[in-house]
Amino acid sequence: MKRVNKKIIGVLVLLVSIGSFYLLKQVQKHGKTSQQETKQKYIDAKTEKPTIHVFDDNKFVFVAQKDGIGGIAFGQDYISVLDVHQKEINQSMIDREKNGSPKIAKDEYFNIISYDLNASGFPSKKTEVYQLLGKKEYRGAYDISQYYADNKDYIPVTLYKVGNNDSRKIIVDITNQKIENLENFEDNGKSTFSAAEQELSKGNVYNNIRQAMKEKYHLKFTAGYIDTLLSKEDREKIDISNTNFAQDYPEMAKDIKDLARLYMRPKQYSTKEWFDTVLHWFAPKGQDVLEVYATDPKTGEKTQIKSYDELQVWSANHTD
Protein backbone atom coordinates (compact mmCIF):
# COMPACT_ATOMS: atom_id res chain seq x y z
CA MET A 1 0.00 0.00 0.00
CA LYS A 2 2.84 2.37 0.89
CA ARG A 3 4.55 1.43 -2.37
CA VAL A 4 1.39 2.36 -4.33
CA ASN A 5 1.10 5.70 -2.51
CA LYS A 6 4.71 6.51 -3.32
CA LYS A 7 4.03 5.81 -6.99
CA ILE A 8 0.97 8.07 -6.96
CA ILE A 9 2.90 10.86 -5.23
CA GLY A 10 5.73 10.48 -7.75
CA VAL A 11 3.35 10.78 -10.67
CA LEU A 12 1.73 13.89 -9.15
CA VAL A 13 5.13 15.53 -8.61
CA LEU A 14 6.05 14.77 -12.22
CA LEU A 15 2.78 16.26 -13.52
CA VAL A 16 3.23 19.39 -11.41
CA SER A 17 6.80 19.78 -12.69
CA ILE A 18 5.70 19.43 -16.31
CA GLY A 19 2.85 21.91 -15.77
CA SER A 20 5.15 24.43 -14.10
CA PHE A 21 7.67 24.13 -16.93
CA TYR A 22 4.94 24.65 -19.57
CA LEU A 23 3.52 27.65 -17.67
CA LEU A 24 7.00 29.19 -17.40
CA LYS A 25 7.50 28.82 -21.15
CA GLN A 26 4.14 30.45 -21.85
CA VAL A 27 5.00 33.39 -19.60
CA GLN A 28 8.38 33.79 -21.30
CA LYS A 29 6.75 33.55 -24.72
CA HIS A 30 4.09 36.10 -23.76
CA GLY A 31 6.76 38.41 -22.40
CA LYS A 32 8.69 38.27 -25.68
CA THR A 33 5.52 38.96 -27.65
CA SER A 34 4.74 41.99 -25.51
CA GLN A 35 8.25 43.33 -26.04
CA GLN A 36 7.94 42.83 -29.78
CA GLU A 37 4.58 44.62 -29.84
CA THR A 38 6.01 47.66 -28.08
CA LYS A 39 9.01 47.79 -30.42
CA GLN A 40 8.60 50.55 -33.00
CA LYS A 41 7.86 49.23 -36.47
CA TYR A 42 9.98 50.23 -39.45
CA ILE A 43 8.53 51.04 -42.84
CA ASP A 44 10.56 50.27 -45.94
CA ALA A 45 9.29 51.92 -49.12
CA LYS A 46 11.44 51.25 -52.15
CA THR A 47 10.41 51.22 -55.80
CA GLU A 48 12.82 49.55 -58.19
CA LYS A 49 13.90 51.29 -61.38
CA PRO A 50 11.03 51.13 -63.88
CA THR A 51 11.36 50.44 -67.60
CA ILE A 52 11.66 53.78 -69.39
CA HIS A 53 11.36 54.73 -73.07
CA VAL A 54 11.72 58.29 -74.37
CA PHE A 55 10.63 58.47 -78.01
CA ASP A 56 9.26 60.44 -80.97
CA ASP A 57 11.70 63.38 -80.90
CA ASN A 58 11.96 62.98 -77.12
CA LYS A 59 8.45 64.36 -76.63
CA PHE A 60 6.82 61.24 -75.20
CA VAL A 61 7.71 58.97 -72.28
CA PHE A 62 6.57 55.38 -71.72
CA VAL A 63 7.10 53.99 -68.21
CA ALA A 64 6.40 50.38 -67.23
CA GLN A 65 6.53 49.03 -63.67
CA LYS A 66 6.75 45.28 -63.17
CA ASP A 67 4.60 43.71 -60.44
CA GLY A 68 3.32 46.90 -58.92
CA ILE A 69 1.23 50.03 -59.19
CA GLY A 70 2.23 53.47 -58.00
CA GLY A 71 5.20 54.94 -56.19
CA ILE A 72 6.47 56.81 -59.27
CA ALA A 73 6.49 60.55 -60.02
CA PHE A 74 6.55 61.56 -63.68
CA GLY A 75 8.28 64.78 -64.73
CA GLN A 76 9.89 66.69 -67.56
CA ASP A 77 13.49 65.74 -66.91
CA TYR A 78 13.18 63.03 -64.27
CA ILE A 79 11.23 59.96 -63.29
CA SER A 80 11.42 59.78 -59.48
CA VAL A 81 10.76 57.08 -56.87
CA LEU A 82 11.18 56.83 -53.10
CA ASP A 83 13.76 54.86 -51.14
CA VAL A 84 12.69 55.09 -47.50
CA HIS A 85 13.66 53.29 -44.30
CA GLN A 86 12.13 54.89 -41.23
CA LYS A 87 10.04 54.22 -38.17
CA GLU A 88 6.30 54.13 -38.68
CA ILE A 89 4.47 57.44 -38.46
CA ASN A 90 1.47 57.53 -36.11
CA GLN A 91 -0.80 59.55 -38.37
CA SER A 92 -4.10 59.13 -36.53
CA MET A 93 -4.97 61.74 -33.91
CA ILE A 94 -5.41 59.09 -31.20
CA ASP A 95 -2.00 57.53 -31.87
CA ARG A 96 -0.34 60.94 -31.95
CA GLU A 97 -1.68 61.94 -28.54
CA LYS A 98 -1.09 58.52 -27.00
CA ASN A 99 2.27 57.52 -28.44
CA GLY A 100 3.77 60.60 -30.04
CA SER A 101 6.64 59.84 -32.38
CA PRO A 102 10.11 58.59 -31.41
CA LYS A 103 13.35 60.38 -32.23
CA ILE A 104 14.89 59.59 -35.59
CA ALA A 105 17.40 56.76 -35.38
CA LYS A 106 20.77 56.80 -37.15
CA ASP A 107 19.71 54.11 -39.60
CA GLU A 108 16.62 55.97 -40.85
CA TYR A 109 16.60 57.70 -44.23
CA PHE A 110 14.17 59.31 -46.67
CA ASN A 111 15.63 59.52 -50.16
CA ILE A 112 14.27 60.43 -53.59
CA ILE A 113 15.83 58.50 -56.46
CA SER A 114 15.51 60.31 -59.80
CA TYR A 115 16.26 58.92 -63.26
CA ASP A 116 17.52 61.42 -65.83
CA LEU A 117 15.36 61.31 -68.97
CA ASN A 118 17.89 63.35 -70.95
CA ALA A 119 20.85 61.01 -70.49
CA SER A 120 21.59 57.69 -72.14
CA GLY A 121 20.54 54.77 -69.95
CA PHE A 122 18.61 57.10 -67.62
CA PRO A 123 21.22 57.23 -64.79
CA SER A 124 19.98 57.89 -61.27
CA LYS A 125 20.80 60.45 -58.63
CA LYS A 126 19.88 60.40 -54.96
CA THR A 127 18.36 63.34 -53.09
CA GLU A 128 18.69 62.81 -49.32
CA VAL A 129 15.80 64.74 -47.81
CA TYR A 130 16.99 64.32 -44.20
CA GLN A 131 20.32 65.89 -45.16
CA LEU A 132 18.58 68.81 -46.88
CA LEU A 133 16.45 69.43 -43.79
CA GLY A 134 19.56 69.64 -41.62
CA LYS A 135 18.04 68.78 -38.25
CA LYS A 136 16.39 65.38 -37.98
CA GLU A 137 13.05 66.66 -36.71
CA TYR A 138 10.65 65.32 -39.34
CA ARG A 139 9.71 62.08 -41.07
CA GLY A 140 8.34 62.06 -44.60
CA ALA A 141 5.07 60.55 -45.83
CA TYR A 142 5.37 57.62 -48.21
CA ASP A 143 3.44 59.01 -51.19
CA ILE A 144 5.08 60.73 -54.17
CA SER A 145 3.97 63.07 -56.94
CA GLN A 146 5.73 65.48 -59.27
CA TYR A 147 5.23 69.13 -60.10
CA TYR A 148 6.73 71.03 -63.05
CA ALA A 149 7.36 74.79 -63.01
CA ASP A 150 10.05 77.20 -64.24
CA ASN A 151 11.58 74.44 -66.37
CA LYS A 152 12.32 72.30 -63.31
CA ASP A 153 10.87 69.20 -61.66
CA TYR A 154 9.75 69.39 -58.03
CA ILE A 155 8.61 66.77 -55.52
CA PRO A 156 6.14 67.91 -52.82
CA VAL A 157 6.75 66.09 -49.51
CA THR A 158 4.50 66.02 -46.43
CA LEU A 159 6.49 65.85 -43.20
CA TYR A 160 5.48 64.79 -39.67
CA LYS A 161 7.32 66.27 -36.72
CA VAL A 162 9.06 64.03 -34.22
CA GLY A 163 7.18 64.07 -30.91
CA ASN A 164 3.75 65.48 -31.71
CA ASN A 165 3.53 64.55 -35.43
CA ASP A 166 2.41 68.03 -36.49
CA SER A 167 2.54 68.13 -40.28
CA ARG A 168 4.17 70.57 -42.69
CA LYS A 169 4.80 70.52 -46.41
CA ILE A 170 7.97 71.21 -48.35
CA ILE A 171 8.84 71.09 -52.03
CA VAL A 172 12.11 69.58 -53.25
CA ASP A 173 13.87 70.92 -56.34
CA ILE A 174 15.11 67.71 -57.97
CA THR A 175 17.34 69.46 -60.50
CA ASN A 176 19.36 71.41 -57.93
CA GLN A 177 18.66 69.07 -54.99
CA LYS A 178 17.47 71.72 -52.56
CA ILE A 179 14.32 72.62 -50.63
CA GLU A 180 12.24 75.54 -51.91
CA ASN A 181 9.72 77.67 -50.04
CA LEU A 182 6.29 76.17 -50.64
CA GLU A 183 4.70 79.63 -50.62
CA ASN A 184 6.33 80.28 -54.00
CA PHE A 185 4.18 77.52 -55.46
CA GLU A 186 0.63 78.56 -54.66
CA ASP A 187 -0.78 76.56 -57.57
CA ASN A 188 1.02 73.42 -56.42
CA GLY A 189 -1.14 70.39 -57.09
CA LYS A 190 -3.01 71.85 -60.03
CA SER A 191 -2.81 69.68 -63.11
CA THR A 192 -0.63 70.97 -65.93
CA PHE A 193 -3.31 69.63 -68.21
CA SER A 194 -6.48 70.93 -66.53
CA ALA A 195 -7.02 73.61 -69.21
CA ALA A 196 -6.61 70.96 -71.90
CA GLU A 197 -9.39 68.90 -70.35
CA GLN A 198 -11.68 71.89 -70.73
CA GLU A 199 -10.70 72.25 -74.39
CA LEU A 200 -11.49 68.63 -75.16
CA SER A 201 -14.75 68.59 -73.20
CA LYS A 202 -16.68 70.40 -75.95
CA GLY A 203 -19.34 68.16 -77.43
CA ASN A 204 -18.51 65.62 -74.71
CA VAL A 205 -15.50 64.52 -76.78
CA TYR A 206 -13.27 64.17 -73.71
CA ASN A 207 -15.63 61.68 -72.07
CA ASN A 208 -16.16 59.92 -75.40
CA ILE A 209 -12.48 59.20 -75.93
CA ARG A 210 -12.11 58.13 -72.29
CA GLN A 211 -14.97 55.68 -72.74
CA ALA A 212 -13.52 54.34 -76.01
CA MET A 213 -10.08 53.77 -74.43
CA LYS A 214 -11.63 52.05 -71.43
CA GLU A 215 -13.98 49.78 -73.37
CA LYS A 216 -11.56 48.83 -76.16
CA TYR A 217 -8.25 48.64 -74.30
CA HIS A 218 -8.92 48.91 -70.53
CA LEU A 219 -6.74 52.03 -70.44
CA LYS A 220 -7.44 55.40 -68.82
CA PHE A 221 -7.08 58.48 -71.01
CA THR A 222 -6.59 61.98 -69.63
CA ALA A 223 -5.29 65.18 -71.18
CA GLY A 224 -1.53 64.66 -71.28
CA TYR A 225 -1.20 61.03 -70.26
CA ILE A 226 -2.55 57.49 -70.37
CA ASP A 227 -2.30 54.95 -67.59
CA THR A 228 -4.04 51.76 -66.51
CA LEU A 229 -7.21 51.21 -64.56
CA LEU A 230 -6.50 50.19 -60.98
CA SER A 231 -7.95 46.69 -60.83
CA LYS A 232 -5.73 43.72 -61.57
CA GLU A 233 -8.53 42.24 -63.69
CA ASP A 234 -8.51 45.27 -65.99
CA ARG A 235 -4.73 45.13 -66.37
CA GLU A 236 -4.93 41.49 -67.42
CA LYS A 237 -7.49 42.39 -70.11
CA ILE A 238 -5.31 45.06 -71.74
CA ASP A 239 -4.72 44.19 -75.39
CA ILE A 240 -3.47 46.76 -77.92
CA SER A 241 -2.00 44.23 -80.35
CA ASN A 242 -4.24 45.42 -83.19
CA THR A 243 -3.39 49.12 -82.89
CA ASN A 244 -1.08 51.46 -84.76
CA PHE A 245 0.85 51.92 -81.50
CA ALA A 246 1.67 48.21 -81.32
CA GLN A 247 2.76 48.24 -84.95
CA ASP A 248 4.92 51.35 -84.59
CA TYR A 249 6.35 50.59 -81.13
CA PRO A 250 6.37 46.79 -80.56
CA GLU A 251 9.00 47.00 -77.78
CA MET A 252 6.73 49.19 -75.67
CA ALA A 253 3.54 47.38 -76.63
CA LYS A 254 4.83 44.14 -75.09
CA ASP A 255 5.07 45.93 -71.71
CA ILE A 256 1.61 47.49 -71.92
CA LYS A 257 0.12 45.37 -69.10
CA ASP A 258 2.78 46.79 -66.80
CA LEU A 259 2.14 50.37 -67.94
CA ALA A 260 2.68 52.96 -65.21
CA ARG A 261 2.21 55.93 -67.53
CA LEU A 262 2.48 56.99 -71.16
CA TYR A 263 2.69 60.77 -71.29
CA MET A 264 3.76 63.84 -73.20
CA ARG A 265 6.47 65.80 -71.43
CA PRO A 266 5.10 69.03 -69.92
CA LYS A 267 7.46 71.43 -71.68
CA GLN A 268 6.66 69.98 -75.13
CA TYR A 269 2.97 69.49 -74.42
CA SER A 270 0.31 70.75 -76.82
CA THR A 271 -3.31 69.67 -76.64
CA LYS A 272 -3.50 69.51 -80.44
CA GLU A 273 -0.53 67.15 -80.80
CA TRP A 274 -1.55 64.98 -77.86
CA PHE A 275 -5.13 64.56 -79.08
CA ASP A 276 -4.16 63.88 -82.71
CA THR A 277 -1.39 61.47 -81.69
CA VAL A 278 -3.60 59.40 -79.38
CA LEU A 279 -6.33 59.17 -82.03
CA HIS A 280 -3.76 57.71 -84.42
CA TRP A 281 -1.91 55.48 -81.94
CA PHE A 282 -5.03 53.71 -80.73
CA ALA A 283 -6.85 53.39 -84.03
CA PRO A 284 -7.13 49.81 -85.34
CA LYS A 285 -3.99 48.85 -87.23
CA GLY A 286 -3.97 50.47 -90.66
CA GLN A 287 -6.70 53.01 -89.89
CA ASP A 288 -6.01 56.71 -89.48
CA VAL A 289 -7.93 57.52 -86.29
CA LEU A 290 -9.80 56.04 -83.37
CA GLU A 291 -13.52 56.76 -83.70
CA VAL A 292 -14.69 59.49 -81.33
CA TYR A 293 -17.73 61.72 -81.63
CA ALA A 294 -18.92 65.16 -80.62
CA THR A 295 -22.55 65.36 -79.52
CA ASP A 296 -24.77 68.38 -80.09
CA PRO A 297 -26.27 69.08 -76.63
CA LYS A 298 -29.48 70.45 -78.19
CA THR A 299 -30.26 67.90 -80.93
CA GLY A 300 -28.21 64.88 -79.84
CA GLU A 301 -26.64 64.72 -83.32
CA LYS A 302 -23.25 62.98 -83.34
CA THR A 303 -20.34 64.05 -85.54
CA GLN A 304 -17.13 62.05 -85.88
CA ILE A 305 -14.09 64.08 -84.84
CA LYS A 306 -10.89 63.06 -86.63
CA SER A 307 -8.53 65.75 -85.36
CA TYR A 308 -8.10 68.62 -82.92
CA ASP A 309 -8.71 71.11 -85.73
CA GLU A 310 -12.01 69.42 -86.58
CA LEU A 311 -13.06 69.73 -82.94
CA GLN A 312 -12.31 73.46 -83.04
CA VAL A 313 -14.43 73.90 -86.17
CA TRP A 314 -17.26 71.88 -84.63
CA SER A 315 -17.07 73.95 -81.43
CA ALA A 316 -17.22 77.22 -83.37
CA ASN A 317 -20.40 76.03 -85.07
CA HIS A 318 -22.01 74.83 -81.84
CA THR A 319 -21.71 77.76 -79.48
CA ASP A 320 -24.18 78.01 -76.61
Question: Which positions does each model-derived feature cover?
Answer:
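N-terminal Sec-pathway targeting helices
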Residues: 1-14, 24
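Surface-exposed loop/turn elements that mediate protein-protein interactions on large endomembrane-trafficking
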Residues: 35-64, 95-136, 167-274, 281-318
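Blade-terminus and WD-like Trp-Asp/Gly-His loop motifs, strongest in beta-propeller folds
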Residues: 72-75, 146-151
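Residue position within the beta-strands of beta-propeller blades
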Residues: 81-83, 157
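Short, solvent-exposed, Trp/other aromatic-anchored flexible loops in extracytoplasmic proteins
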Residues: 136-149
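Acidic/hydrophobic-patterned starts of short beta strands in beta-sheet-rich repeat architectures
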Residues: 152-156
